Structure formats: structure tokens, C-alpha cells
């Protein structure tokens, strides 16, 4: 009886502890991020949207680090309407990728950079409401281009 009580009390203390997140190796982070980006690109390619030959609008300079990458992905996600085709899965995968990158940043970056506004995409709510499908398609196409650029420059994810 005494052993049972002692065991129960010791297990109670363990349940009250919170695990300390371990610093992840940046190589593992880049490998997982690469896989997640590739999955998103496959999903974007598989969906049927008008494919425009858009001139490149992003350069490697736009990948200032993980904070700016996460901010851009979150902005793309906010511009994509739930009402167009099969975008719910794409939005879920974007959220998963941004959550993973945010978690990695939180655990591995000592100094957190503040989020900045993302230039080049419509921000006004009224414009988004009036042209919701056009804004969604534009955001999907821009995100596809951005993800391809990110795939070629995964080292920028290590920059805090």
C-alpha cells in the first residue's frame, strides 16, 4: 500500500513537468522543410487552375530569413479563399509548414525578429472581397513561385 502511494505521487510529479524543447539540427529542419515544400508544390501542380506565364516577381533577396519566409507564407494563406476548388488541403499544409518553421525559430533563434508587412500582395479587405477568386489564384501562383525559390535557397531558413 505504501509503495502504491509513493509511486502515484512520483508519477504525479512527472505529469506536472513540461518537456524542454530540444534544439533541432538545422540539417534535419531543412530536410523536413524541403519535403513539406515539395508536397505543397505537388498539390499546387495537381490542382486545375489557369496557368499563367507570370514574370518572376521574387528573387533570393526576398528570402531574408525564416521570419520573412513565415510572414510571406502566412500572408499567402490569408489571401487564399476557402471557396475555390481543393484549397483547404493546401491551406492546411501551408499552416503546417509555417507552424513547423515557427517552432524551429522559437527553439533555435535567440533573437526573434519582429514580423514585417509583406509588400506586393493586396492587403485591403475590400479588394479581397470584390475579386476573391482572382486574388486567390494570384496568391496561389505567387506562392508556387515563392516555394520554388525557397526550394532552391533552403539555407535562408537558418537565418533568424
Swiss-Prot record:
It is found in: Secreted. Disulfide bonds join 109-160. The keyword Disulfide bond applies. The keyword Transmembrane does not apply. Residues 1-17 form the signal peptide. One of its GO terms (cellular component) is extracellular region. Coiled coil: none annotated. It comes from the Eukaryota. Keywords: Disulfide bond, Obesity, Secreted, Signal. May function as part of a signaling pathway that acts to regulate the size of the body fat depot. Belongs to the leptin family. This is Leptin. It comes from Tetraodon nigroviridis (Spotted green pufferfish). The gene is lep.
Amino acid at each position: 500500500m505504501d509503495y502504491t502511494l509513493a509511486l502515484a505521487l512520483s508519477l504525479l510529479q512527472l505529469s506536472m513537468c513540461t518537456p524542454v524543447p530540444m534544439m533541432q539540427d538545422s540539417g534535419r529542419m531543412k530536410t523536413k522543410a524541403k519535403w513539406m515544400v515539395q508536397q505543397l508544390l505537388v498539390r499546387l501542380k495537381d490542382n486545375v487552375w489557369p496557368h499563367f506565364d507570370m514574370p518572376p516577381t521574387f528573387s533570393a533577396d526576398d528570402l531574408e530569413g525564416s521570419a520573412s519566409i513565415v510572414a510571406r507564407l502566412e500572408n499567402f494563406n490569408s489571401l487564399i479563399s476557402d471557396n475555390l476548388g481543393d484549397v483547404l488541403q493546401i491551406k492546411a499544409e501551408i499552416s503546417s509548414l509555417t507552424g513547423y518553421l515557427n517552432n524551429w525559430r522559437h527553439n533555435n533563434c535567440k533573437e526573434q525578429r519582429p514580423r514585417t508587412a509583406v509588400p506586393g500582395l493586396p492587403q485591403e479587405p475590400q479588394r479581397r472581397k470584390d475579386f476573391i477568386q482572382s486574388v486567390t489564384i494570384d496568391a496561389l501562383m505567387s506562392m508556387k513561385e515563392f516555394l520554388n525559390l525557397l526550394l532552391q535557397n533552403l539555407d535562408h531558413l537558418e537565418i533568424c
